[in-house]
C-alpha cells in the first residue's frame, strides 16, 4: 500500500491532498513549460468520454462540429473593446517567427468569439442562412499567474459552442437550453450536483450581455465554475458587421450565443468525489470501469483461466482492465484504488474453491462475495449503485453546507466556515469588490427561484447605506472559489 502512503489526508491539507492525488493517480505530469501539464491516460480517457457524451447531446440540438484557427490577428481581436479588456492580462502573443518580426501581432486563442464572428460574417447573408450552430473541441491559452493542475493552467482543453440567430428570443432561449444541458450532464454522468443561475454584471463573461453558470461545491467547501453559457446579443455582430436580410427584407444584425465546459471538469471530479486513497471516477465517465485482479495465480492456474473468462465476457460491453502481473495483491489493489477505478474484481484461489470472486467498490471499499454465474449481472448493478451513491453523497454535502445569511456578520462567519451563503443582494459592483477584499468570497450566481426561510431578509450590504430596500430583490450565492 505504499502508493496510498504518498497521499496527504485531505482533512490535514486539502491543497496538498489534491496535488498528491493528481500526481499519483496516472492523471497528469507537469509539462516542461511552467504552468502546463501533460494529460495522462487516466485523465485524458475521462476527457474522451466527456467529448463522446456531449457530442451526442449537442447533435440533438443541431450542433455541428468544426475547427477554427489558433491564431487571431491583433487588429481583428481588438474590434470588440470590452472583450479585449477582459482578456488582455492573460493574452499570449506571437511577435516573431525565426529572426523576422511579424508586421502584425498574432493573439494565441484565449477563446474564439472573434474567429467565429469573422466566420459568421462571411457565411451569413439572409435569414435562410440562420441559425448557425457550431461547436469546436480545442485548446486555448490564457497566461494565468497562479496555476493548479486541471483548474488553472496556461493551456487547457475545452469545447466552445458558438451560434448565430435571427432573433433575440431564439438566442436567449438557446443560451438557457445549453446551461440546462450542462446541469443534466454534470448530474447524470459526473455525479455532481450544481447550483445554477445568472452571473452578476461584474462576474459575467467579457463581451456578454448575460452569462449563466453551473457552480459545484468541492469537498473543502469552495465553489468551482463547471460550465457557462453566454447570451452575446449583438455585442459582437454589430462591431464585426454580421448582418443579414430578415423576412421583411430589412438589414439586421444576428444575435449570438457562446457556451462551454473545459478540463476543469477533471478537477471537479477529483475534488467532489476523491478520498484519502485517491480519485474516485463515476462509472458513467470512467475510462476503465472494472479492474480484474489475478490473486496468487502462480499457485493455482485456474485463477488465470477464470479471470480471462470474466474479462472476455465483460469487455464486450464495458471498458475492463485485467491485471495478470506478478505484483503483490496489495500493490494491485492500491493501484486500482489510487486511479479511481469504480469497481474491482479479485479472483483468487480461496474464492474459487467456493465458486465465487470478490467485488470491491471504490466508493465505499465494501467487499462482497459474488457467485461466478452472477458476475455479469452484478457488475452492472454495482456500477449503477456506485454512480448513484456518489451523486447522493455530493448532493447531501451541498445541501448541508448551503446556508442563508440574515445579516453581514452572519454572512462573514459562514464564509469563514467555507459555506455556500445565500443572501439578498443588490448586485452593486462596488460592494462585490469590497466583499471579496474583506472575505475572499465572490458572487457565484443569482438564483432564479429561492424559498426564503420564513424571515424577511435585508440586503447584505444595507447596513452601510449602500442600497435601498427595493434594490435588494435578487438572491445571490456567495462562496470562496477556485
Curated annotation (Swiss-Prot):
It holds the Pfam family ProRS-C_1. Keywords: Aminoacyl-tRNA synthetase, ATP-binding, Cytoplasm, Ligase, Nucleotide-binding, Protein biosynthesis. GO terms for biological process: prolyl-tRNA aminoacylation. GO terms for molecular function: ATP binding; proline-tRNA ligase activity. Its EC number is 6.1.1.15. It is found in: Cytoplasm. Signal peptide: none annotated. Its main location: cytoplasm. It is an enzyme of class 6 (ligase). SUPFAM superfamilies: C-terminal domain of ProRS, Class II aaRS ABD-related, Class II aaRS and biotin synthetases. PROSITE patterns: AA_TRNA_LIGASE_II. It comes from the Bacteria. SMART domains: ProRS-C_1. It catalyses: tRNA(Pro) + L-proline + ATP = L-prolyl-tRNA(Pro) + AMP + diphosphate. Catalyzes the attachment of proline to tRNA(Pro) in a two-step reaction: proline is first activated by ATP to form Pro-AMP and then transferred to the acceptor end of tRNA(Pro). HAMAP family: Pro_tRNA_synth_type3. PANTHER family: BIFUNCTIONAL GLUTAMATE_PROLINE--TRNA LIGASE (PTHR43382:SF2), PROLYL-TRNA SYNTHETASE (PTHR43382). Homodimer. This is Proline--tRNA ligase.
